[in-house]
Amino acid sequence: MIPERLEFSGIKQTKFDCVFSMGLLYHQRNPQEHLQNLKDFLKSDGQMIIETIIAPDSYGMALEPVDRYASMPNVHLVHTDLGCKSMFEDLKLDLVSESDSVPTSHLEQRKTKWMPFKSFESALNQDNQSLTIEGYPAPSRKFYLLEPKF
């Protein structure tokens, strides 16, 4: 496992059986490039596992937050399921399997003695927990298992 940014890893010629992108897609200024870079690290029979937050399909391809999303300043696009699948198709990635969409829980991201700052709970509208404090739909997570079409 190499838990570091691909562009800084110095392993450009290495091919892997499996690559993971866990909670990174929505932080990318160019998510297609991120996925293409991951694909480039796969063996021809390799697999890619993507975990990301998704927006409701009513947003079309993606929700593009102004300034912040759920208190996070570095969220550029929150794709819908349709938007993710369209990107996968454009990049010639076969969708092998997918999870259901599951709302993010305050139990996953909470204050602890090691992280005593604001938590996920503080990023939600206190009067309506289905919305972020910015008024966007609260995050839901989804996993995708992909294989390259070479």
Segments and roles (model prediction):
Residues 16-31:
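A short SAM/SAH-binding and catalytic strip from SAM-dependent methyltransferases
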